[in-house]
Amino acid sequence: MKRAAVLGVLMTLVVSGCQAPERPSTMELPAAAVDNAVAKLTGIAEDLMNSSGIPGMAVAVVHEGKTIYAKGFGVKDIREDDTLDNRVNRDTVFQVASLSKSLSASVVARRVGAGSIDWDTPLVSKLPDFALADPAVTAMVTVGDMFAHRSGLPDHAGDLLEDLGYDRGYVLSKLRELPLDGFRTSYAYTNFGLTAAAEAVAAAAGKSWEQLADDVLYEPLGMTSTSSRFTDYENRSNRAVGHLRIDNRYEPRLQRDADPQSPAGGVSSSVADLAHWLTMILAEGGSEALLPAVTPQIVSRRPTEPAMRAGFYGYGFNVGTTSAARTQLSHSGAFELGAAANFVVLPSADVGIVALTNATPSGVPETLTAEFADLVQFGEVREDWRGLYRDAFADLDAPVGSLVGKTPPTSPAPAPPLPELAGTYANDYWGPATVTERDGKLTLSLGPNAEPWPLTHWDGNVFTFGFLSENAPPGTISKASFNGDTLELEYFDAEGKGTFTR
């Protein structure tokens, strides 16, 4: 209650134009806490690089308005020789994945500060064609609701449509077909919900989101290597290539183009650039426009035992409290296809750290920033962050599907005549699925990408297919079950939408 009261007073003073009081006191930091923590960073980073085997990483720290540490480790692309040109440095550009959400919230805060929009602006006032399943929610849902993931949309709504190659407009138009949970009473992480809010902010500005981010955040802060466009990332000469983990080895396999959800996950940047942004967050976090983003707006993680602290989400920021009773702002970014990122800001210590990697997420950036935060606050690492994050990320890249790890039947029932299964099966949400028979084999294709997936007979009218995408890690297997003119696709049955008919 005391913290809430302080923030309430701060907001009142900002609105009235008075000078805000100093932050409330917290437990004193150990002597030379930040300098001592920074002195150990290189050793921590090198140890994590060696133990994880990831190809590359970059780290930066800001304190008292300055960048006091910025360094690269490892290589940008394991296919190339370990030359100076292939080594990661402070200016190497990485994809930052969902760390984009905090950057995008900063863009919105700039527009709120300019008076052109508000966190409480309803989306439909700027996007008249936008809709959700409930007309009442459609009328009320705001920019802030979407940035806090409290609209009621299902977790990661629309992400699988993106994997199939659908563009931003198509995915946003399909959100209205998804069932809603409690409006403003439930938390579910949605990339395309946040993207819809960003589109509303861009519409109010009369320009694309990508240009708006350039104009109000990246250019003013001197973030010359930062962009919300995938083509800019592709064209950087000093660029870290994403590496996918397959059989405990890292290799560049696929590139992740996140343009459809750019405000939520499509930013690319360097730690040198992100240091400018972290410095701004520390300097302007108490401003009227940014404060709502960096303070709790909804409970994102409920305690499972009395001794646990709840987790909160602001607008594009995780907001929590450390065991030293310090407010902590943070966010992670994770692409299965080869990117992992994390930043942590401790406003009361006036310090922030960011770590970027070019590999399938395994908890390395989170471990590094957590150990650094412990060193700053306590002078020592107090928790087994390596074990905690290793366990937390263990299932992140596990294959998906009910048949994963199962052995095909030794005496399966015969399949129906394959030509009888061929055809186009319609689905209002996913679009048509095409089953093609050629030379006694079936393939399935779906979505704009229309990648042909071989169908392998399993048992009777059940076939299987496997594929690799951002949400389908290596080893993923899905059932494809035929029943007359009906085709059921297990992987695409989220929200009960996996039935296709011809």
Regions found by a protein language model. Give the residues of each.
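Short, conserved catalytic-motif segment at the N-terminal edge
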Residues: A31-F94, G113-D118, A133, R168-G169, ...
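Short, well-ordered beta-strand elements
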Residues: I68, A341-N358, E488-E490
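Contiguous hydrophobic, core-forming segments of folded domains
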Residues: P347-W385
